[in-house]
Amino acid sequence: MFKSRIGGKLTLQLDDAELGLLAQLFEQMAELLEHPESENVADPLAKMLNMGGSTQISEDPALARLFPDGYSDDEHASADFRRFTEEDLRAQKVAAVATAQETLSEWTGKSTLTQEQAQDWLRALNDLRLVLGTRLEITDSGDRYANPNSDTSGLYIYNYLTYLQGTLIDALT
């Protein structure tokens, strides 16, 4: 649970089970975000200068959710948008996850976060929820329990991440 403190900092308190769960989830997220060698870079000069990324949306629905098309009605514009933005966006997501992992690796029962670290946590938790929601086929908050074949442990984790994100938003505001 996140709580605000005087001076703009926040505290995070977790029990051992929460700590273990979050460490595992952030490790999986880091693995998901590892950038594969892209064969889809359209501009050879951009590839040589490491200036551009893939022009194709990922076949993995979770990655497609994290890196959606910029223009749903213009395939060419969407490819250009992806080529020039995905690498930077991916780096930001990796950095946010790394901040959360660092917080957990230095765990002593309670942690104090700066505003910048809290923003990284917010990004990382949001991305975890997007990935898990995609894997569980949750399309909006109203249908969380609509699929009788849903993984109930996955739903519990999704709800926990939602709660944790909510406490962080409350602490930030």
Predicted regions and their residues:
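Extended, compositionally biased non-globular segments
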Residues: E102-E106, S111-T114
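Surface-exposed helix/loop patches within compact recognition domains
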Residues: V94-V97
